[in-house]
Amino acid sequence: MNLMAERSLENAVGEKMNATASSIKMRGEKVCVFYGEKQALFDVDLDIPEKMVTALIGPSGCGKSTFLRSLNRMNDTIEGCRIAGRITLDNEDIYDPRLDVVELRARVGMVFQKPNPFPKSIYENVAYGPRIHGLARSKAELEEIVVTSLQKASLFEEVKDRLHDAGTGLSGGQQQRLCIARAIAVSPEVILMDEPCSALDPIATAKVEELIDELRQNFTIVIVTHSMQQAARVSQRTAMFHLGNLVEVGDTEMMFTAPTEKRTQDYITGRFG
């Protein structure tokens, strides 16, 4: 290979490495989580790529939800919980004492296992976040945010004639999409989803899964799921947890067809879990 070709190859490799580095939205480094004296996570190193869906899988109690909650400091609300290691968002340490946790949770939104709409109207459920964060300068701007968020959550057409009805009056699947619209409304960069379909029927689950695929065009998504089929359908990256350890992480297709770790193979094939 001549010198020009070598330099061209080096430049191409360098550009690829830079692109890869810049595409990491969040990063966990040696993350350990303790509940009192009990250690729930052990030295977890995990990168969350930008504008992709990363699925966290593993048996109950493996630490996947604990790690998820660490990504926007929801574990701060649990008495006796402490974290060691480092988690960054755009290379900024989210556990820096100077960091505004309210602002962090606006940037890293959360959708919980059970739909939890506020006891307010559909409109007010979505308008609440933008209003308290000062994202709308007028009533018209606020209305635009509400409508756009409901559209992005694939819910607007179903509720446009009853925006002032109670959000709690919607079906379970609609309530979950309302919660997703509520998260979207404050313009997050990352959306965390903790088993968002576990309380939904198959039809509602399919709608939420379609929505997740659409949302990844604009948002980085991390989802905890017990459903191997769901992880395979919606994610591009999968991380396997077991007994508080990150066992393996990789492209979803490779993880489900040719995992390198026996524990991953055994879990995916139903030998334990």
UniProtKB/Swiss-Prot annotation:
Keywords, sorted A to Z: ATP-binding, Cell inner membrane, Cell membrane, Membrane, Nucleotide-binding, Phosphate transport, Translocase, Transport
Enzyme nomenclature, EC number: 7.3.2.1
Chief subcellular location: membrane
Family matches, as InterPro entries: AAA+_ATPase, ABC_transporter-like_ATP-bd, ABC_transporter-like_CS, P-loop_NTPase, PstB-like
Entry membrane topology: Peripheral membrane protein
Gene Ontology terms, MF aspect: ATP binding; ATP hydrolysis activity; ATPase-coupled phosphate ion transmembrane transporter activity
UniProt catalytic activity: phosphate(out) + ATP + H2O = ADP + 2 phosphate(in) + H(+)
Subcellular location: Cell inner membrane
GO biological process: phosphate ion transmembrane transport
CDD domains per UniProt: ABC_PstB_phosphate_transporter (cd03260)
Keyword Cytoplasm among UniProt keywords: no
Keyword Translocase: yes
Residues that coordinate or bind ATP: 58-65
ABC transporter domain sequence ranges: 26-268
Highest taxon in the source lineage: Bacteria
A GO-annotated cellular component: plasma membrane
SUPFAM superfamilies associated with the record: P-loop containing nucleoside triphosphate hydrolases
Principal EC category: translocase
Known role: Part of the ABC transporter complex PstSACB involved in phosphate import. Responsible for energy coupling to the transport system.
Subunit structure comment from the entry: The complex is composed of two ATP-binding proteins (PstB), two transmembrane proteins (PstC and PstA) and a solute-binding protein (PstS).
Family: Belongs to the ABC transporter superfamily. Phosphate importer (TC 3.A.1.7) family.
Protein name: Phosphate import ATP-binding protein PstB
